[in-house]
């Protein structure tokens, strides 16, 4: 399962991912198993036990959603864990501690000195063997990590491996959108760095008709395209090198790229920042940061969404966590909701975008909200 949920002071802040796996868990329990073992990761503890990344705070919310008691174990592998699982009876549900507390889960980590280290292959083999010993059948309902070659994904050696309901639902929505979308197909991309989204941009250019690029990554494109002065806005040096290649592919594939034409800027990232509108002609002065789409860009984005029949959105349009820099993202969401009401298919993915949707209480107003975070 993917219980990698945000915590605040030891309490689950957003239970969406936990709730997403409840139907699969309940279905398995209907078959009267001897026991059910749940394994997940949380955060990035880099192969070490870090208490703030413990899965224990997930327990109360999981018990509440299931309406039954769940046993929590302080580790995920080893003799004690195997014995506890072996002695489970009457459909006992067991939640293991964070898989990523062990370097063998990801195969690599960062040590206390900040050096990158690799796991010992023999230890990885033992880790995977111990995970395998915890059950007879393997169910994968963790869409958010299904793309990773981690031990819990690829190293649990059971002949019968089954996709859970959540994984099935995610794959159905994305395969429909990518393989047989109702055209026009628009993808909206945001976030900070171009290089983090290279694969996504590349693959989407094979499928879409129009692409809106916003958020921090837009400034890297605008710097390359127009030599725009971007002040202190986000700039991705690595991504800058491949902008031409991406735009050339878009041209070949006849994909219309929409970049911001104006920006709401701040002199800091804080809620009390002074703000000003700048555009392609003026550029952004030194000491100022592009933090949201400007009014002209918001209007142009609305036009693109209004003509789309399939919409996939991954990444906000600005620093929406601060109210004054929220308009670009919240207005876009309103337009996506309006278009969904009139028949478009809308899929929202990416952790920040999903957070926006939940804050606006709009999860049931779009076609599908993915649990996959960046994996979406």
UniProtKB/Swiss-Prot annotation:
GO terms for biological process: gluconeogenesis; glycolytic process. (2R)-3-phosphoglycerate binds at residues 1-4, 17, 40-41, 43-44, 99-100, 147-148. ATP binds at residues 192, 197, 216, 290, 321, 352-353. One of its GO terms (cellular component) is cytosol. Belongs to the phosphoglycerate kinase family. It is an enzyme of class 2 (transferase). ADP binds at residues 191, 215, 320. It catalyses: (2R)-3-phosphoglycerate + ATP = (2R)-3-phospho-glyceroyl phosphate + ADP. Transmembrane segments: none annotated. Monomer. Pfam families: PGK. The keyword Nucleotide-binding applies. AMP binds at residues 192-193, 197, 216, 290, 321. Mg(2+) binds at residues 192, 196, 352. It comes from Glaucoma chattoni. The gene is PGK. GO terms for molecular function: ADP binding; ATP binding; metal ion binding; phosphoglycerate kinase activity. CDP binds at residues 191, 196, 215, 315, 320. The keyword NAD does not apply. Keywords: ATP-binding, Glycolysis, Kinase, Magnesium, Metal-binding, Nucleotide-binding, Transferase. This is Phosphoglycerate kinase. Its cofactor is Mg(2+). Pathway: Carbohydrate degradation; glycolysis; pyruvate from D-glyceraldehyde 3-phosphate: step 2/5. Its EC number is 2.7.2.3.
């Amino acid at each position: 399962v993917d219980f990698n949920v945000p915590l605040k002071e030891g309490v689950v802040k957003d239970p969406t991912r936990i709730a997403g796996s409840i139907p699969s868990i309940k279905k398995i329990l209907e078959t009267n198993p001897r026991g059910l073992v749940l394994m997940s990761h949380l955060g990035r503890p880099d192969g070490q036990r870090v208490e703030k990344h413990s899965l224990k705070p997930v327990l109360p919310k999981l018990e509440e959603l299931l309406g039954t008691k769940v046993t929590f174990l302080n580790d995920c592998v080893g003799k004690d864990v195997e014995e506890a699982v072996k002695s489970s009876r009457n459909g006992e549900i067991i939640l293991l501690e964070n898989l990523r507390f062990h370097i063998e889960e990801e195969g690599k980590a960062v040590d206390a000195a900040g050096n990158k280290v690799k796991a010992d292959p023999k230890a990885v083999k033992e880790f995977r063997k111990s995970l395998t010993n915890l059950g007879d059948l393997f169910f994968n309902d963790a869409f958010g990590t299904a793309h990773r070659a981690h031990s819990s994904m690829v190293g649990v050696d059971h002949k019968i491996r089954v996709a859970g309901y959540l994984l099935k639902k995610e794959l159905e929505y994305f395969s429909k959108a990518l393989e047989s979308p109702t055209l026009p197909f628009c993808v909206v991309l945001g976030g900070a760095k171009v290089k983090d989204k290279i694969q996504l941009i590349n693959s989407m250019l094979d499928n879409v008709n129009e692409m809106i690029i916003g958020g921090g990554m837009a400034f890297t494109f605008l710097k390359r395209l127009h030599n725009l002065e971007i002040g202190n806005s986000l700039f991705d040096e690595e991504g800058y090198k491949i902008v031409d290649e991406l735009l050339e592919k878009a041209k070949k594939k006849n994909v219309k790229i929409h970049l911001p034409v104006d920006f709401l800027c701040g002199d800091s990232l804080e809620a009390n920042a002074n703000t000003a509108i700048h555009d392609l002609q003026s550029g952004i002065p030194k000491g100022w940061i592009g933090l949201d789409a400007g009014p002209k860009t918001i209007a142009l984005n609305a036009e693109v969404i209004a003509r789309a029949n399939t919409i996939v959105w991954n990444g906000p349009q600005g620093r929406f966590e601060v109210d004054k820099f929220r308009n670009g993202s919240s207005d876009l969401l309103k337009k996506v909701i309006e278009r969904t009401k009139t028949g478009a298919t809308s899929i929202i993915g990416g952790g920040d975008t999903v957070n926006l949707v939940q804050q606006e209480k709009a999860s049931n107003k779009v076609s599908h909200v993915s649990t996959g975070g960046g994996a979406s």
